[in-house]
Structure formats: C-alpha cells, structure tokens
C-alpha cells in the first residue's frame, strides 16, 4: 500500500505505508490522521485515500471528490458508489 516513499510513514514527502504521523505530500495510509497532501488512508489533506478531510478523499470524510462519502459519513462532490 505504499505510494511513494517509506513504507511505514512519518514526516516528509511521500510517506508510504500504514502508520506514522502522516505529514507530507503523498502519504500512504496515515493512521494518525495528520495534515498532508495526497494521504492514502486517513487524515486531513489533499487527495486522502480512505477518510478524513481533504480534496478527493477516497472512502469517506469531507472533501471534494470523495469516492464513498456515505460509507464513513460526511459529504463531498463526485461520490463513487
């Protein structure tokens, strides 16, 4: 599930895997739900994958372009079901 860089996350550009603080651009999963652009699984940021706030979040939360806004609650544009 790593997207760009290190597998388990943390600070920096392109953190990859499940945990870590999730700061930075292109985080993979970000289980601690922090700020960042392009987070994979959770947290705030642009293009987050699974939940949390952000533009283009994948599974839930608030944001423009959520895939499944009703899955976790919240709202967004362009919901996929």
From Swiss-Prot:
The keyword Repeat applies. One of its GO terms (cellular component) is cytosol. Keywords: Keratin, Repeat. The keyword Repeat applies. InterPro entries: KRTAP_type8/19/20/21/22, KRTAP_type_19. Pfam families: KRTAP. Interacts with hair keratins. Belongs to the KRTAP type 19 family. In the hair cortex, hair keratin intermediate filaments are embedded in an interfilamentous matrix, consisting of hair keratin-associated proteins (KRTAP), which are essential for the formation of a rigid and resistant hair shaft through their extensive disulfide bond cross-linking with abundant cysteine residues of hair keratins. The matrix proteins include the high-sulfur and high-glycine-tyrosine keratins. This is Keratin-associated protein 19-3. It comes from Homo sapiens.
